[in-house]
């Protein structure tokens, strides 16, 4: 049977891998220790320092603790990790025992041996270790063969009983809740199963009669098991610790016959807790039977028992808990009632028992009251008393009278004594307790009667003792004294038994030892309790002393024993919840404080004799009379005395004076006497914690129980002896390293070798002689010596391994050198072959050989195909023939089966006389044999034919598969040929098309070049014109900037101008007379208008010409774009086919020099391609490799061509882009011209309107001219101030540029550092990959060594078993030899003393004895030789195993060190990754800031250019205006000669002044804002620069520190890796296995390199951007110098602009307002944009958080789904198993029914035969004796058949029962799986709902983000609108400048 496949095996013994893992931890016997801890009992520590009596211990996580040496306890080597027997521990101490139990309990290994003890810890859950399969494992096995288990101890007891013919006992002790009752039940079930198995064996040997089978419907084993429900119902209750606690002790004796069959059973009980009937503590409950009665299992039971109240109203049982979680009282009552039936309780007995239970509940509700002024109690209501009396079957009045006024004897008379209420209540409680105790006694007696089977001899028994363990509570009373006294007795029994066995072994081994009886250690405490004048004697004495109290008892005890007895002490003051104590007693488990309250009453246990008399007189209740039958009241004793019967008198006296202590002591003495007559086995139950939590150990609680259970006491005894022992061969084999020379002797003589080895160790002062003893077969060691030997062995082994490693390294380096030389030679050969192939590949004959060879092979393939087709046809014919033969054989078999069936039918139908039946049966049997022979032959032939048919079918399938493969290959070849031809045609077509396109492209390129030259000339001209226009605009802008200073004065002038205009309106009528002059002026204006129109026509003509050219160019561009798109489509197709050829693309990129060279090279390549294509047609039938090569060449060529096309496309696109730029410039010029045209048209209209008002302005011209002169001076002053501010701005801008350059340089340095960090990171990752590969290789090697070690260990175990068998044979031979010697000595003494034998006879006897002795000696020598050989083999294998194990350990250590280093590498790399990521983030931030600053700088530069242009324009305008002002001044000085011209100019100047004023306002505001922005930018740049410098300094320092640290780490790692590489060179043998992993890692490395390259590209791009910014800054500096020059020129021209100022003011105001509106809207949009950005950032963070949560939820759902699928799989498996079992069950039922029918048929046949036998007997004279004899034989045969079938039916029924049980188990498992599935389904639904909710939230967040994005886009649109408005304002300013230029040209 494969034990390890059993589901319960993992809870019994660890696997080999787990053992090796546990035993591989580091250990130092001198440093690893245990130290006390308040929570965990003991914790592990390492001694770091010793100072006097104190030691400093490191306890993990850097913590240290200083303790005294006395409290430190040694730690055992890893060899003893989770050991199954704690007595083998080399350091036997409390800490090691606790740790071993804790470690095993954590692995759910709940059973552990401790010498003779079996310690079991309550697991608080169901474990599959009590099943039938587990029980069968342990049957018949030795204790050492199997893991610790209750069944192992039970089976050992059973085997000892059968083999030694000695009674056995199993002592199960422990605290309440530790699992005593459950273990007792398991023991009883195991013995019942073993007995039943023995019963089946016995029944198979000797058939039972039908009468016996009918009688025995319920087996004895079932009845034994069914005693548990009855005893648990009446003796178990809920306590705080245990829901089913046994409140009594029991000793169950199971009697067996000599054959091992269960014969009978009887039960004895002890110390029943009677007080629980009337009193329960909080959290506890009364006995189960009281609550089962209320469960309504029997519907009318409560009515019959008069229980008409709820259970909570019955005082005796309702003082605490009423229900128990997890226990159904109804189901329990059903089990109890069924057990009553199985145990043969009659319905009347059951009912009477229930009635007595109900009567006690009614008694608890009886109430009494005190009569006024009397010491007399009376009933307070009689309903409950009447119900109780009815249940008792007595009169209620007599019952109440007996309670309130009992009869007592006063002198010689009997009188009724009055009782007070306290006495009555005490009497009621005492009666209830006494009655329940007697009911329990009756139940046990009844069970014993049922289990007392007759007819089977009771030769031996196994007793199971289930009794409470030692108890130390806060309040210890009379009950605790007796429980502790019993445990003292049991511990003394154990100590005596344990060391008797121990010292018997010492005597057998012949070592020196002084006998010690450790049982005497407890004798003092036992004598204190039970001896005369002891506690029990004084308690009994006080019970008969008048007026004695509990205090007088306590005082007498103190006076008698305090200070006189060592175990009697004065109690210490109470602590915490402890109660007051009267005295203390020192037990083996500790000192217990006892309180004497109520001891006298509990000991006397008085009963009301009058009530007992009333109950004994019951006529309706037989049970109550029976339970009180043995009780003799005082009246009965007096009556018996009066009659003069001495026996009665003696009986009455003993009944009156028997105390509880006397009864307990009597039963205890019987128990101990019985145990002393048995061979004991000890089981100690442990409760792990008070919380009933599985897997949790409360160290203090467990240590206390180990003390109370005697486990630690047993360890104390072991320490005084030699607890560790090793066989001589094992010792020699394991420690041969310590004394190699002496160990050689040990191979032949193990004992001598062991002695010599130990002597050498003593001589070397490594051991002391008193620490060990050498026995006959074993070496005995004191505690701790084995650990010392292990340390010595490890040291020697380490030295040997070091030398071995050096040799191995040298050997592998030699192999590596040889391998490298071979590799170099192979590389040279490969290079030579490749060179030869490169020369041959262009040789024509070699190409021809390549073409011809496939054709030769194709011909062979066709021939092979034809042969295969012929073979297939042959095989098909053979298959058809074989199928026909098979069909014929099947028909013959069917025919034979049919004939057999017919013969059987005829056989059944034949019913004649006995002789005819016999003859027919004989004939039928012969025919049957013949037919069976034929059938067998036919079956064999059929099997042969079927095998042949199967083989033929296999061959047929193989041939068909080969044919199919050949067909497929042919088809593939044809398809490949067709595909190659099609590809060739397509390639040729593509090549021709591409050549045509190339020619077209060349033509187009030449045309484009010509057009480009022409366009460049035109662009040059346009560029010159644009430069001139820009210069003019620049001058105007500069003038505008200077005029902005005069805005404030201009505003005042505007107000005055408005007033003047009002005056002018009044004087309009006066100007009508001057209309003629205006008409003349109009004619002049018409003339100028016609001139302007002619100029406009010329401009329009030029524009039309340019438009035509532009359209032509656009058409050409569209044509080119269309061609390029077509080229792109074709190139895309080529790219799809040639995407994998990167190397060719790089070569093509490097191969082009210029366009003509590219064309020539392309032509050559096309020619090569054509030749390659022709060769491709010829080589179409070659191998796939050649076809692949051809495709590769084609793809390379096509790729080069595609890349050339890409270059052409790029050049064409560049040309198109240039043309597009030119077209855009022309379109812009056209737009400007159209705008100027519209402007001129508007000016003309305005001039026409201004003529009407010129007359009004003449009078004011002089006054305005004078005002202009004043304002001009003011404007000059403001212009000077503006120039100074502009110079300041230029200087600040220069500083900003220099700072920007510094920042760029710093960014470059930072990027260089990041590149260095990336290189270092790549280096670390490479080293990490190398270390990982080495670690994986070592782990595989370690696995191989581990497997080898396992195999050797298994062989070693087999050899050990063989040696043990041989040793046993040797011992047997030795015993026979010694026996013969003894007999020889006896004969010799007899001869010498008595002379009964003569000399001849004596010589003959002597010869026989000598002959026997020589034979035995020869056998012994043979056994010794065999043992020596086996030991040698075992030693050799053990040495090999140890060597392999050491090598595996070394590799494991190396692997662990590499793993640690790998983890360190991982940590270092993670830190570097984190730092690099931080640097990337900082770099991104710096680059972002740099981009922002560069953008702002660019914006400032643009604004600066705009301002410069405005200033320059304003300067020009100012100059022109100054000239005009000077001319006007001259004309005014001349008089009114030019009034008309001045009025016209004044009107124009006023309009221009308004426009200039608006432009000036706008320019001034823009300049102010730019100045503020410049200042802010300067401050921000300085702050950013300081922060960046600070960060760079910190990072540089941090980089330097890390560089130093990592350099040191790299150096140390490099040194370590060098040494490790030398040591691990042997692991390169598994390199092939790791190639797949290496490929994957290389792919990952490629991805990482690609990512690194992308990062480097990004860095280079950023560097390019920074360089561009630097270039931009340089250009800005150049422009600044130009601006300074323009500014100086503008200052010279500023005086000219005075006259134009007033007109510019109005326009500048409007522009300023528009600008402010735009700026405010822009600011609002920017703020809104910032808010949206922040919201987007928050939403992005929330989204990422939600994504993380969703990922977590998805992982949870995935785990839940996996667990769900696993549960479903388990459910399906369980369902399939259940279905299979159901099918088996149905099959067994059908078989059982069939057997039943056959049985009935046989019975009818027997009846018929019986009738025939009767008829034959009647006709005996006629038929003769011979017929009768034959009939009787026939009858016996039928009877034997009937018995056989009956046995089969019985076995089938048992099989059916087992199948039913399995079905129920599987149904339970399916239900559990279904529950788990439902739970998982609920979890999945919850997670799904949560996921949906989070998805909804994510969608809402995305919607919100989209809305914000739409808002952002809206703001951006409004911002663009504002920019357009600003552009329109600039255009307005351009118009002003153009007007100014026009006026200047006119003048």
Curated annotation (Swiss-Prot):
Residues 856-1947 are annotated as: Rodlike tail (S2 and LMM domains). It comes from Caenorhabditis elegans. This is Myosin-2. Residues 1053-1075, 1125-1155, 1231-1245, 1516-1529 have a biased composition (Basic and acidic residues). Transmembrane segments: none annotated. There are four different myosin heavy chains in C.elegans. GO terms for cellular component: cytoplasm; muscle myosin complex; myosin filament; myosin II complex; sarcomere. Residues 28-77 form the Myosin N-terminal SH3-like domain. The gene is myo-2. Muscle myosin is a hexameric protein that consists of 2 heavy chain subunits (MHC), 2 alkali light chain subunits (MLC) and 2 regulatory light chain subunits (MLC-2). Interacts with itr-1. Residues 668-690, 773-787 are annotated as: Actin-binding. InterPro entries: Kinesin_motor_dom_sf (IPR036961), Myosin_head_motor_dom-like (IPR001609), Myosin_N (IPR004009), Myosin_S1_N (IPR008989), Myosin_tail (IPR002928), P-loop_NTPase (IPR027417), XRCC4-like_C (IPR014751). Gene3D superfamilies: 1.10.10.820, 1.20.5.340, 1.20.5.370, 1.20.5.4820, 1.20.58.530, Kinesin motor domain (3.40.850.10), Myosin S1 fragment, N-terminal (2.30.30.360), Myosin VI head, motor domain, U50 subdomain (1.20.120.720). Belongs to the TRAFAC class myosin-kinesin ATPase superfamily. Myosin family.
